Amino acid sequence: MPTSYGYTTLLKTTLVCCLLTALVSIFLPALLPLTATGSAAVIIFTLYFFRDPERRIPLDQQVIVAPADGKILLIQPLDHAFTGNDSTLVSIFMSPFNVHVNRIPLDGTIVHLRYVPGKFLMAFDNRSMESNEKMEIGIDNGSLRVLFIQVAGFLARRIVCPLHRNESVLSGKRFGMIKFGSRVDMILPAAVKIMVQSGQKTCAGETIIGRY
């Protein structure tokens, strides 16, 4: 089933494709087979892009799961005001072919929520973390604080994040998406042992990024 976050886009895409096909059938009937095939392909890809499969969420309460499908782009040490010194940055690159529904990485309470306007550099460009439009989300579970960031990209210029400050959230819960690719950056405190490596594929809600 497609995610509800994509219903508007799906409706608009379907209407445009149907209208285009209808107009071609009237004014340029010779191009109808090509137009109909192209329109069907666009609709099928849009449905594929907004797919939202179920996931097996780990029951272990001491793990942090991936917030996004994709591939580990970068792991590096980082000091951050929200998570403290000796934190670790883990960046997940999402291609247009990945599932784009994002999921909460651990149980806790939303204590930080900040939208930051910015540029739309390519997601695999590490400057995008600082320069691009993004949504910062911070969770506190009483034992540690984790920050994760939805980063817009060159193609992905629409961040969806319906969360609210002081909202209680559960690990693996769907919470939004980044439309048409980009990246999600995680900043994990020193207490977290990183369980992934660069180049590894991730599955939102299932892949264990770290333990604490």
Swiss-Prot record:
It is a peripheral membrane protein. It catalyses: a 1,2-diacyl-sn-glycero-3-phospho-L-serine + H(+) = a 1,2-diacyl-sn-glycero-3-phosphoethanolamine + CO2. Pathway: Phospholipid metabolism; phosphatidylethanolamine biosynthesis; phosphatidylethanolamine from CDP-diacylglycerol: step 2/2. The modification Pyruvic acid (Ser) is found at residue 182. One of its GO terms (biological process) is phosphatidylethanolamine biosynthetic process. Its cofactor is pyruvate. It is found in: Cell membrane. GO terms for molecular function: phosphatidylserine decarboxylase activity. Its EC number is 4.1.1.65. Pfam families: PS_Dcarbxylase. Is synthesized initially as an inactive proenzyme. Formation of the active enzyme involves a self-maturation process in which the active site pyruvoyl group is generated from an internal serine residue via an autocatalytic post-translational modification. Two non-identical subunits are generated from the proenzyme in this reaction, and the pyruvate is formed at the N-terminus of the alpha chain, which is derived from the carboxyl end of the proenzyme. The active site is at 182 (schiff-base intermediate with substrate). The keyword Transmembrane does not apply. Heterodimer of a large membrane-associated beta subunit and a small pyruvoyl-containing alpha subunit. Catalyzes the formation of phosphatidylethanolamine (PtdEtn) from phosphatidylserine (PtdSer). Belongs to the phosphatidylserine decarboxylase family. PSD-A subfamily. This is Phosphatidylserine decarboxylase proenzyme. The gene is psd.
